[in-house]
């Protein structure tokens, strides 16, 4: 028996359930998000549903359903079984250098395949797509080339707008609402390569444990969800970082500090970035071996990624490997090789 698509009339009942404070089952939430992402809900219904969820508070089941639906509708690519994504929700309004993007390059240079998923900046000065474009990556590269880059170089960039065309049905309502909704959490949960390992940053600590559970439900083998004590959606070097790890079906929470990786504390102003061109220049300098607080935070995040991927026993070991990948020129070479495959066409 075929499943009938959820219609605009059907979603009314689901909106009413949420509006009265009732949590949706994963099946009911899937029906709602299937309607929304298929264009079978009106803008008013989408806005009403998203705000009802926001006011009541989104549940693990609802976030899982939304992310799974987004994954199902994505333009998929293949990545090696051990691939990791290093990604943040954005929304921390910190205006830092591009940390996860640089950490992804360093992690790949250490031999761990990275299926990097990201977008242009929403609340910051420079998103991962912005800085990579400034470095010479072609955001519109054929998806087969992105797949090839991951396979041959160990890293490729999946530009979210290329992979999630279903978001066109949600964009008008999100724009008119002008406030955070469940969709601000979904990007890092909807990796088009289905990476089974993930280092994910989030803009608020309240989401650290729930999103680790969501990643587990979505099939992650091991994942860290992190939030810096300074508000960063990254592992920070200005103080402690709260971590929820999903592994072996269990979520475990703990805090880490730069000292765990043998790194010094930084000041927030030392991590301030600028526009994509300036951030690209800083990233190039980092790959050349220039030692700054930016390098330290990138090494720390890469160290964590290596731990998550099973390529380092602990943060100190991971940090040493990450630093060596930079100092040997391997990380710089990784960027050059990626650009050789998915670089912007000559003008």
Curated annotation (Swiss-Prot):
Record-listed 5-phospho-alpha-D-ribose 1-diphosphate binding positions: 88, 91-92, 96, 98-101, 116-124, 128
Transmembrane region(s): none
Pathway it works in: Amino-acid biosynthesis; L-tryptophan biosynthesis; L-tryptophan from chorismate: step 2/5
Protein's name in the database: Anthranilate phosphoribosyltransferase
Taxon lineage: Bacteria, Pseudomonadati, Pseudomonadota, Alphaproteobacteria, Rhodospirillales
Chain positions recorded as anthranilate 1 binding sites: 88, 119
Record note on quaternary structure: Homodimer.
Gene it is expressed from: trpD
Residues the entry annotates as binding Mg(2+) 1: 100, 234
Highest rank taxon of the organism: Bacteria
Residues holding anthranilate 2: 174
Reported cofactor(s): Mg(2+)
The EC number(s) this enzyme carries: 2.4.2.18
GO molecular function, one term: anthranilate phosphoribosyltransferase activity
Recorded catalytic activity of this chain's protein: N-(5-phospho-beta-D-ribosyl)anthranilate + diphosphate = 5-phospho-alpha-D-ribose 1-diphosphate + anthranilate
